[in-house]
Amino acid sequence: MSDDFLWFEGIAFPTMGFRSETLRKVRDEFVIRDEDVIILTYPKSGTNWLAEILCLMHSKGDAKWIQSVPIWERSPWVESEIGYTALSETESPRLFSSHLPIQLFPKSFFSSKAKVIYLMRNPRDVLVSGYFFWKNMKFIKKPKSWEEYFEWFCQGTVLYGSWFDHIHGWMPMREEKNFLLLSYEELKQDTGRTIEKICQFLGKTLEPEELNLILKNSSFQSMKENKMSNYSLLSVDYVVDKAQLLRKGVSGDWKNHFTVAQAEDFDKLFQEKMADLPRELFPWE
């Protein structure tokens, strides 16, 4: 196993925990069930935060489950070896996560009533968060510098491919009734209201005190202190420095890292790539 990428259908994956044959099975053979709830994101867009919220919604705010079972078991990654196997044996209703672009997602989803919550985030913050996260992980190709990672991200030669392609692939689904589009920014700005929106989408109701418990137990500080959610359980086989894996949980951190030239270049790239999508889709713009 090397610090490189596994390539499948032109998309990069880690070399540990993923296999081309499993990725093919996920797309062609995995059966999505109508009761499934799926968290769909491009990496570093708030996946674990949303998973924590959904787990707490399931337990009505009670923290016992999230404090006793690792987050990757509560919401497994369907495309990973472990996740694919576990989910195939899990009874309904299932909660799981995926970073897959639309062309690699299980085909069975498109004829199912399963519910997808797609969480997107300002790609500038995604870029910064990804740089600090991935450089601490083993079994992936690492950039020599921040500048090199910036270039890779703009070109789409990073894990799970281009952010722009990921968004473009999934956005046509946003009008479907089993697809909820959210942004990290709105979740951050008004977490309570966004949780209510998720409840409405999933057909769930929460008492005010249950909502307050969810807000308390899914806060960044609570997650950082919860060893089942903060990655501290990850084996040293996977990680270089665990301290960096849950960093800030804020919006706008990119301003502390982009040079003026990088900010200008990225603005130009964003305008070019996203010109065909309505501006109001992106609350950070």
Curated annotation (Swiss-Prot):
GO terms for biological process: 3'-phosphoadenosine 5'-phosphosulfate metabolic process; bile acid catabolic process; cholesterol metabolic process; ethanol catabolic process; lipid catabolic process; steroid metabolic process; sulfation; thyroid hormone metabolic process. GO terms for cellular component: cytoplasm; cytosol. Liver, adrenal and at lower level in the kidney. Is present in human fetus in higher level in the adrenal than the liver and the kidney. Changing residue 147 to K: Decreases of the sulfotransferase activity toward DHEA; no effect on the sulfotransferase activity toward pregnenolone. It is found in: Cytoplasm. InterPro entries: P-loop_NTPase, Sulfotransferase_dom. The keyword Flavoprotein does not apply. The keyword Nucleotidyltransferase does not apply. One of its GO terms (molecular function) is sulfotransferase activity. Its EC number is 2.8.2.2, 2.8.2.14. Sulfotransferase that utilizes 3'-phospho-5'-adenylyl sulfate (PAPS) as sulfonate donor to catalyze the sulfonation of steroids and bile acids in the liver and adrenal glands. Mediates the sulfation of a wide range of steroids and sterols, including pregnenolone, androsterone, DHEA, bile acids, cholesterol and as well many xenobiotics that contain alcohol and phenol functional groups. Sulfonation increases the water solubility of most compounds, and therefore their renal excretion, but it can also result in bioactivation to form active metabolites. Homodimer. This is Sulfotransferase 2A1. It comes from Homo sapiens (Human).
